Amino acid sequence: MLLRTNYYTLIGSLPALPRSFEQLDRVPISPLKLDERLKMLEPHDARVIDEMSNFLVWERQPLEQTDEAILRRYDKFNREVDNRFARELISHTMAIRTIFAALRCRRLQLAPPQGVAPIAAQIAKNWNHADFRLGAQYPWVIEVDRQLNGDAPFDLERMRIELAWRRLHRLAEEHYFSFDAVVLYLMRWELVYRWTQRDADVGQRKFEQLVTDAMGEFANMFG
């Protein structure tokens, strides 16, 4: 049995993450500095963090990855990571992804998507129920389905990240200086990074559009 290591120095060196999702305006520590802090991990724990980081970075690229590819990567993660807490966290992330994908498929009158068992089987069995009979465990399913009626992918991504944030924040209040606390910090940091990068990408596109518009007006002056 592996001994559980406490990481007082590591946790103490990490800047606090915001308590509220509304405060996710910037990452409190850069990826480079975070990597430096994580060098304090024991080798086995460092491997778990590496596998989690690789999976999370890979999973957040929906335009480049098919559901089948993500499931293969998820199976690989479970085979190679023996930390139960880390596996449970990634499993929950995949469950949320599967529910969102199922709601989209149903809206488009497609077949149920592949997903993580047993939730994929539950969804397929209850395909015609509004919340796939998952409402007791995931009370937000109906609201996500309602959001899909509109044309607001930004709001849907915000909801997905906020749901994950709330759960991780609750769990973080139960873990302090253990490796589990490090895992929870990484998961929450990744959400902050994803959200702030999304804002940065939007801002860059707006800036580029302003430049394009301005250049167009400039060209028209001499047209």
Can you say where each PLM-predicted feature lies in the sequence?
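Extended alpha-helical surfaces
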Residues: 1-223
